[in-house]
Amino acid sequence: MLLPSKGCKLILLVGVIILWMSQAAAAAKDYQALSLEDCLAVARQQNPVLSGAREKINELVADYQAARSKFFPRLVLTSYYDRQPPNRFAPGGSTPIELFKREGYTGVLGKQIIFDGLKTYYSTQAAKTGTQSQKQEVQRTADELAFTVTQAFYQLIEAKENLKVAQEALQQRQEFGKLTEAFYQAGKVTNLDYVRAKSQVSEAEQAVVEAQNAVRLAKEILSRTLGLNEQVQVDIKGKLPQEFAAAGDMNSLWQEVLKTNPEIKKLDLDIAQSQTLIKVARGSYLPEVSLQAGSDVKHRDLGGTKPEWIGGVFMEYPFFEGGLTRAQVAKASSQTLQLLEKKRDRLNGIKVDLTTAWKDQENARQGVATTRQTVATNEEAYASAQALYRHGKAIGLDVLQGQVDLTGSRFQLIRYAVAYEIGKARIKQIVGSNQSESYQPSRSGGQKP
C-alpha cells in the first residue's frame, strides 16, 4: 500500500490550517460591518429573550394537546400476582372449604367520556386561544427587540460621530495652541492667553478619551442586545439621517395602534380565554356521563383460570363539594374582570407612550433644523474670530469661545438626529409591525393547533 510522502502531509496540514483561518476570519468579518437590517436579522436569531418567547409557544401547544386528549378513550392495563395464607379468616367466619393461596390478575379497563358539561371542549378552546395569545406576545417581544436594537445601533453611530467631532476639536485647539505659543513668544499675547489655550487642549484630549470609551460601551451594548457571544467583536456601517419627515397625525397613529398593536391583541385574546375558562368552571355543575368497560383474566390455584368482563354507562353527579365549583367560577370571573381593567390601564399607558414618542420625534426634527442654522452661524463666527485673532483684532478668548460654541452645536446636531431615529423607531414599535413572527414547532413535540 502506498503511503503519502512527508511533503504531501505538510501541504495537507497547511491547507487545513489556511481553510480554518479563512473560515474564522470570515465568521469574524460577518459582524464587522453590520447595517441596521443585518443587526435586526442577527437579533431575531440570537437574542435569548425572543427565543424564550418562541419556546413558550411549544409549552402552550402541549397544553392544547393535553386538553384535547380527553376527547379520546383512556385505556389502562392492570396486572398483579399475590399470595395469601391458607388459614386466613374468611369473610363470614370460618369455613371447612379450602381457600385459595395464589391469585393472578390481568385486565384492561377503558373509559370514554360522553358528556362532561362541555368542560373538555371549552378547555381545548381556551388552550388554543392561549397559544394564539402567546404568538402575539412573541410579536410584541420581536417589536420591542427591534426598537432596542435600533436604539443601540444609533447610539453607536452617535458615539462614533461624537468621537469625530471631539478629534476635530482637539486638532483645532492644538493648532490654536501652537499659534498662541508663537504669539506669546513674540510678545503679542499675555501668559494668560497662552495658559488658557493649553488648558483647552487638555480638555479636548479628555473629551476624545471619553468619546473613545463611549464607542466601546456602545459596541458592547449592541453586542449584548444582539445576543452574541462575548468573544465576538461587533462593528457597524451607517450614518446619520439626512432627511427628517414629520411623525404624522396623532389621531391616525392611535387608530392604527388599536388595530395592529400586538400587546392589545394579546390582551383581547387573554380576555377571550378567561371568559372560556368561566364556562369550563361552570361545567362542573353538570353531571359526567361516560362509557366504561373492562375485560380481565383471573387465575387461582383453586378454581383455575376464568375470564371476566364488565361494561356499562356511568353517570357521576357531584351534588355537594363544599362550594368548590362555586369558588372556581368566582375565581375565573375575577380573573376576567382583572384582565378588563388591565386592558383599560394599558390603553392609557400605550396612549401616553405614543404621545411621548411622537413628541420626541417632532422635537428632534425641529431641533435638527434649528441646530443646523446654529452650526452654520458658529462656523462663521469661529472662522471670523480666528481671522481677527491672527491680525491682532481679537483676543484668544474670542477664538476659544467660538471653538466651544461650534463643538457644542455639532454635538447637539448629532444628538437631535439620533433622537429623531430613536423616536421614529419607538413609534414603529408601539404601532406594531403587523407581521407575524415566524414560528417553528420544536422537534421534541408540539404542532400548530
Predicted stretch roles:
Residues A211, P262, Y416:
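Metallo-beta-lactamase
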Residues L3, K9, L34, E144-E256, ...:
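Periplasmic alpha-helical coiled-coil/stalk elements that build and connect Gram-negative outer-membrane
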Residues A26-V76, Y80, P86, E230-A272, ...:
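Bacterial Sec-pathway N-terminal export signals of envelope proteins
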